[in-house]
């Protein structure tokens, strides 16, 4: 077991095994069985490339052997920052064959985030494209390797400069090693299969260990409530590093059933609608902001989208009007809302739930042994129908962040329930309704941004005396960030200058404020904290005056 990982208590592990939730098989062994069973079926389509399950397994095996040649070993951590291309699947499953632990970084992460992941995890390698959207990832990895001696390997998809390994060459190169060597590697199903990421409210990223046992079960249960089967075809358009497109049911859930996954490295309607028509896509997972963009694109009426059966929507609450308009434009589809978190617990509206229930709720847990508590500020369970903080425990919900004992003491109850920070109410149907959140996060199009992280950076600006970042409503993204700033005497600051300053700190683009409010003072709570409710109310009133709300 990797040091710093919090195991499930033995009594719970025994229960989950006895009930058949945990099969004590690694993702490597699960994938090997899938590849043998569905060998001739197409697994992935990436633009004009079609790859069968057998071909995917063969290339992942060859890559795994070559990664062993380059010095990677079981339990080594590897930062994976690849776009939605077939090489992602080759690399992901190659790491599983070795027993390495991928760290699922987003393409938008920059030096600040990636260097933190490397430091927290002790990562041995990092893989990324050479360039994407005018950003040079080779320069990023070179800087991080210079700062962190544990990062031994830089692997590049595309043009690999001197000192880097070419991912394409590693996939194609024959190894002198035997594939049997991979089978001899012992993988503990209770070890992490991967690390998902959680920004949290402190701004310091945390690593979420998802074990082989819990992540296989996660994918199977998500597939069971989304009508996945061998004849279904998924369009994966959200970044594969996210939990939803990877395993809820995502790529893993469709593979388990021998389905087909079409990868898209764009979200534009002009690219997506032809893909749906050409490949007869049955399932797609989105965030509300993306769905809103699609249904407002005039091109949507020019393509045959009648193959679509399920649109999963997650990350934010979907407004009933958007659901109604989607159904009007694509009568064949059921919009299935879900609530999930990389930490584990998933809630899905069931496809056969009553229309009123689907309109009002985000679903209910997918496992019979998922445990939910709604509690008040003193951890007392609230009365039925009342709002409380959502606490979760179950066979695929983590028991602790990696290497974070002090934070874990605050993030979990003494009996192992995870404190989500989300406020919920139980619907009479048994499903749940999201009512807000306790944690200081801004939800921009499904990406959760720590207000504290951005505030700490803004406070380093020489013109800033104090700052509070708050969400402002947005019809498409749900929320955008507004920075409320008190300036130092005699100083001035404009939004473009603030954005440029933050960009120099090399944080992800989605964390940049999109509105700046200069204020004389902040209302303080009785405990001396800035009243963010007062700020959001003041800005909401201003937006109404401007006709923007």
Question: Can you describe what each PLM-predicted range is?
Answer:
Residues 39, 161-162, 175-197, 204, ...:
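Conserved pre-ATP/AMP-binding loop-to-beta segment of ANL
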Residues 109-119, 126-130, 284, 394, ...:
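AMP-binding/adenylate-forming catalytic core of the ANL superfamily
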């Amino acid at each position: 077991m990797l040091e710093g990982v919090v195991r499930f208590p033995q009594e719970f592990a025994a229960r989950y095994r006895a009930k058949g939730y945990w099969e004590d098989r690694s993702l490597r062994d699960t994938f090997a069985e899938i590849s043998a069973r569905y060998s001739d079926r197409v697994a992935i389509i990436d633009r004009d490339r079609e790859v069968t399950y057998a071909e995917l397994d063969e290339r992942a095996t060859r890559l795994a052997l070559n990664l062993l040649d380059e010095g990677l070993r079981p339990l080594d951590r590897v930062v994976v920052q690849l776009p939605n291309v077939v090489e992602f699947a080759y690399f992901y499953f190659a790491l599983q064959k070795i027993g390495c632990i991928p760290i699922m970084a987003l393409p938008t992460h920059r030096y600040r985030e990636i260097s933190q992941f490397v430091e927290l995890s002790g990562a041995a390698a990092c893989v990324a494209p050479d360039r994407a959207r005018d950003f040079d990832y080779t320069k990023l990895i070179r800087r991080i390797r210079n700062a962190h001696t544990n990062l031994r390997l830089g692997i590049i998809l595309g043009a690999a400069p001197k000192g880097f390994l070419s991912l394409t060459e590693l996939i194609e190169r024959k190894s002198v090693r035997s594939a049997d060597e991979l089978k001899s590697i012992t993988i503990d199903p209770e070890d992490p299969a991967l690390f998902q990421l959680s920004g949290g409210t402190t701004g310091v990223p945390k690593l979420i260990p998802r074990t082989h046992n819990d992540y296989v079960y996660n994918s199977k249960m998500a597939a069971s409530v989304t009508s996945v089967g061998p004849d279904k075809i998924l369009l994966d358009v959200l970044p594969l590093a996210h939990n939803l497109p990877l395993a809820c049911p995502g790529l893993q859930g469709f593979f388990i059933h021998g389905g087909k996954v079409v990868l898209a490295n764009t979200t534009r309607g002009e690219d997506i609608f032809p893909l749906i028509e050409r490949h007869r896509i049955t399932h797609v997972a989105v965030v509300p902001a993306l769905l809103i963009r699609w249904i407002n694109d005039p091109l949507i009426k020019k393509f045959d989208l009648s193959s679509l059966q399920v649109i999963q929507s997650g990350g934010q609450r979907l407004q009933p009007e958007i659901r109604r308009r989607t159904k009007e434009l694509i009568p064949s589809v059921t919009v299935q809302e879900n609530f999930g978190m990389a930490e584990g617990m998933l809630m899905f509206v069931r496809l056969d739930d009553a229309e009123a229930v689907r309109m009002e709720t985000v679903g209910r847990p997918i496992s019979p042994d998922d445990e939910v508590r709604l509690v008040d500020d003193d951890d007392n369970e609230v009365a039925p129908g009342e709002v409380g903080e959502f606490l979760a425990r179950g066979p695929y919900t983590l028991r602790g962040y990696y290497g974070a004992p002090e934070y874990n003491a605050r993030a979990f109850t003494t009996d192992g329930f995870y404190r989500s920070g989300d406020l919920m109410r139980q619907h009479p149907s048994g499903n749940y309704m999201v009512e807000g959140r306790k944690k200081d996060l801004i939800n921009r199009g499904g990406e959760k941004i720590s207000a504290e992280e951005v505030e700490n950076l803004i406070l380093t600006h020489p013109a800033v005396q104090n700052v509070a970042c708050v969400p402002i409503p947005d019809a498409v993204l749900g929320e955008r960030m507004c920075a409320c700033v008190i300036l130092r005497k005699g100083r001035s600051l404009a939004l473009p200058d603030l954005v440029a300053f933050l960009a120099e700190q090399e944080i992800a683009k989605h964390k940049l404020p999109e509105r700046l409010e200069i204020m004389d003072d902040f209302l303080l709570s009785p405990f001396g904290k800035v009243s963010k409710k007062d700020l959001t109310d003041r800005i909401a009133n201003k937006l109404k005056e401007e006709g923007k709300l």
